[in-house]
Amino acid sequence: MDMEALKQKIEGLDIPQSLKDELFEKLSKEKDLTEEMVDEIIDEVVNAYRKALVEPYEAVGIVAAQSIGEPGTQMSLPYEEKIIIKEGEFIKPVEIGKLVDEMIERFGFEKIGNSEVCDLPIDIYALSLDQDEKVHWKRIISCIRHKHNGKLIKIKTKSGREITATPYHSFVIRKDNKIIPVKGSELKIGDRIPVVKHIPANCVEAINISDYVSGNYVVDNINNKIAPKINGKSIPNNIKLDYDFGYFIGIYLAEGSVTKYFVSISNVDELILNKIRAFADKLGLNYGEYDNNNGFAESHDIRIYSSTLAEFLSNFGTSSNTKKIAEFVFGANKEFVRGLIRGYFDGDGNVNADRKVIRVTSNSKELIDGIAILLARFNIFSIKTKTKNQFVLIIPHRYAKKFHEEINFSVEKKKSELERLVSSLNDDKTYDSIDMIPSIGDALTKLGEKVDYPKVILKKFERKQKIGRATLQRHLRRIEELAVKKGVNILALKEYWLLKKAVESDVIWDEIVKIEEISCDKKYVYDISVEGLETFTTFDGVLTHNTMRTFHYAGVAEINVTLGLPRMIEIVDARKEPSTPIMTIYLKEEYKDNREKAEEIAKEIESLTLGSIAESISIDLWTQSIKVELDENRLADRGLTIDDVIEAIKKKLKVKIDVDGTTLYLKIKTPSIKALRKRIPKIKNIQLKGIPGIERVLVKKEGGEYVLYTQGSNLREVFKIDGVDTTRTITNNIIEIQEVLGIEAARNAIINEMRNTLEQQGLEVDIRHLMLVADIMTADGEVKPIGRHGVAGEKGSVLARAAFEETVKHLYAAAERGDVDKLKGVIENVIVGKPIYLGTGCVELTIDREYEEGKNMEE
C-alpha cells in the first residue's frame, strides 16, 4: 500500500483533522489490507462520523454536541442557485457555484476552518439591501465554499419566488422597523422575507454583435459591419440598444424561432408585422413572407435572411422551452428594456379588465424569471405561478397604472383593455395580501397620537404587526394633512421617517408559504461576503444574507458550546484550552438590571479587530496597496477614531498609510499580489479594542438580571473590568481557573463541569464519583489529566499502567528496569486472577489443618 497515496486520500476527506491523523496512523500499520478493504474502512469511518453529527439540542446517548449559530461555515447556497452580479457595466445572473469556483481557480483561496475563502482583488458587485430598505450595488469582498453532507431547505413565497439553501444559511427579516439576520432553520410559514421590486441599472447604450457570435465572421471596424466569412449579408456590428431593437427582441421571444440561416416570426397583427419589416429594412436585410396554418389558427410568417442575426438571437434561446433573457439585457438602456417588455407582452401577454389582471405565459421558466427581473427596473412587481404545462407571470392590478405609464401595449385591443382596467381601479381600496409591511412596532400608533389621529383605526395594525404598503401610505398622507392643520412638525419625528422608509422601500416583504427539506447532491455549497449589511440578491429576486458578522447583543447570534462525550474528554484530559472556550459573566448590582450598562461592558470586553470594523479590506491593484474602507458608524459605536485605527496598525506592521476620508491605503516596500494577499489576514486580526481571546459577547436576561456570555475566555483580564461580579463569573477553562483562582477552585470547577455535562445528557451519576475524579486530578496541587501523561502514568503497579494504554511499551520498559509488581491494587489482581487486596483479601493468616483436626479429636 502506497503511504503517500493513502495520506492524500485521507486528507481529502471531510472529517476533523484529529480523526484523519488517527485513521492514517492505524491504516499505515496494517500491511495486509487491499486497496478495496482500505476504501471500505474509510467509507465506514466517514459514515460513522456523519451519523454522529447532530442538530442543536439533539442528544444521542452521551455523545451530543451542540453547534449553535455556526458563523460562515454552514450558511450557504447550492451550486445552481443563481445570484445577480454586476461586473464592469454589465449586470448578469450567474450560478453562485460557477462564480465562486472560477474566482478560487483564478485567485486561489485561504483555508479557514472547513471553508475555502477567496478574497477578491477585483471589483464585482452584488445587489444588496441596506438598513434604509433601499437596494444598492455593493462590492463582493470574498467568495466562500465548503463541503456539505446534510439536507437543504427549499423556501417558497406567496408571490412564487423560491430559494434553496442550507438550514443554517442566514436570511433577513424585518423586526421593529430594522433589518436583522435569522437562520433559515428558524424561519416558519407566515414569516416574510424581502424580494426586490426595484433594480438600479447602469444602462449599457450599445453592444458589438461580434461579442455574441462564434469566430466564423469577419468584422469591418471602419464601416462598422459584421458578415459571415463565406457568403452572407453584413449587418452593423456595433448596434445601439434602443427601443426598436428591444421591441424586435421582445417579439422574437414571444413569437420567434431561428434556423442556421434565417429568423422567423409569426403573427397576424399588422402593426407588429410592420415593426418587424421596419427593423429588417433598418439593418438592410432581405425577408420573405408566408401565410401559415399550423393546425391551430391562421398566421403569417416573416423570415429575415441573416445567419449573423440568427446566431446572435440564439443567445435568447432557439425554441419555446429554451427562451431566456441574454445577459447583456439586464444592464441595458431603459428604452431598450421598455421596448423588449412591450414586444414580449404584445406577442404573448394578455389583459383582462374584469378580472383585474395582466399576465403572460411561457414554456420557459428562465424566460419568466428574466422578465420579472426586467419589470423590477420599472418598479413593477410580479407574481409567478405555474399551470400544468406553462409558467405564468401575473402583474397585480395595483401595478396596472405603472405598467400603463412605463410599458403599455402597441396592439390596439390589448391597449384599450389595459386603459379600461386602469380607469376601473379605485384608489381608496388599498388592501394587498402580498405587499404587506411587517413588524412596524408601535411607530404608527405613536405618530397618530402626535396629531390626534383616531387611535382605534391604528391600534389594529399595531396588534396584527402588519399593514399593506398602500394602506400605510394612505394613513401617512392623512397624518401629514392633520399635522399641517395642527402645526405639528412631523418631519422632526423619528416614527414618521421609520414609516416613510418602509413605504418607499425597494423590496416586497413576501410571505413564506412552503418550507421543505431536499437532498444535496453536490460536493460543495457556496456563499459570498458583501460590503455593508452582507446581503445579496438571487435571480428569483430573493434578498438573502451571508453571515452574522455584525454585533448582535440581543441574542441574534449565539455561542458554540461543546457538550457530551467530547466535553467529558476535554475535562479529564485537563486540556489547556477547551475546543469552545466560553465565559458566563455576572454583573454587580448597579449594572445587572440595566441593559444599556450591560451592553457597555459587553463592548468593553468584546475583542474588536480591524476586520470586524472595516466595510472591506481588499487589494487595490491601481495603487498596489491594501485598501481598508472603514465604517464611520461602527467606529463611532465602539468609541474609536480613524487615528486610533492608524496607531493600532502602525504598532503591528511596518507600512506606509495614506488616508482618503474613511479609506486607508496600506503600502509595503515591495508590493506584489502575493505579498499583499499574505498580509490581509494579519491586517484583519489587528486588535483595536477589547480583551484578546474574546471574539463575541452576548447579553441575555436570565432570572431578572442581565448576564454576559462570551465566545472565548480570558478570566484574568475580565476580572479587571469594572462592573464584573468576580464572585460569580465563571469560565469553562479549568486550567485558567487554576492559574487565577487556585487549585481548590479548579477542583470545584471539574466537579461542576462534569456534573453539568452529564445532566445535559439526562444522565445521573453519584457526585461522590465525580468528587473522587476531581480529587485524584488535583491531589498534587496542580490539575493533572487522567491518562498516560498524568494520573494513570504515575501508578505504582506495572500491570495497572500496562492495562491503561500502550501495554507493550509499559511491559517492555518494566522488564528492562527489573520492576516488581507487588499486586496491591484492584486492577493488577483482577488481571492475574487473584483475590483483590481489599477486605478479607487483606488477611494473610494461615491455618494448620492437622493441628485443628487433632485438637477436635482430643475434645
From Swiss-Prot:
Annotated keywords: Autocatalytic cleavage, Cytoplasm, DNA-binding, DNA-directed RNA polymerase, Endonuclease, Hydrolase, Intron homing, Nuclease, Nucleotidyltransferase, Protein splicing, Transcription, Transferase
Gene Ontology CC, one term: DNA-directed RNA polymerase complex
Record SMART domains: HintC, HintN
Example GO molecular function: endonuclease activity
InterPro entries per UniProt: DNA-dir_RpoC_beta_prime, Hint_dom_C, Hint_dom_N, Hint_dom_sf, Homing_endonucl, INTEIN, Intein_C, Intein_endonuc_central
Keyword Hydrolase carried by entry: yes
Keyword hit for Metal-binding: no
EC number(s) per entry: 2.7.7.6
Main location group: cytoplasm
A GO BP annotation: intron homing
Pfam families: Intein_splicing, LAGLIDADG_3, RNA_pol_Rpb1_5
Reaction(s) catalysed (UniProt annotation): RNA(n) + a ribonucleoside 5'-triphosphate = RNA(n+1) + diphosphate
Subcellular localization, as worded in the UniProt entry: Cytoplasm
Entry comment on modification after translation: This protein undergoes a protein self splicing that involves a post-translational excision of the intervening region (intein) followed by peptide ligation.
HAMAP family for the chain: RNApol_arch_Rpo1C (MF_00411)
Main function: DNA-dependent RNA polymerase (RNAP) catalyzes the transcription of DNA into RNA using the four ribonucleoside triphosphates as substrates. Forms part of the jaw domain.
Family indicated by similarity: Belongs to the RNA polymerase beta' chain family.
Subunit relationships: Part of the RNA polymerase complex.
PANTHER family attached to this UniProt entry: DNA-DIRECTED RNA POLYMERASE, DNA-DIRECTED RNA POLYMERASE III SUBUNIT RPC1
Entry protein name: DNA-directed RNA polymerase subunit Rpo1C
Source organism (scientific name): Methanocaldococcus jannaschii (strain ATCC 43067 / DSM 2661 / JAL-1 / JCM 10045 / NBRC 100440) (Methanococcus jannaschii)
Gene field: rpo1C
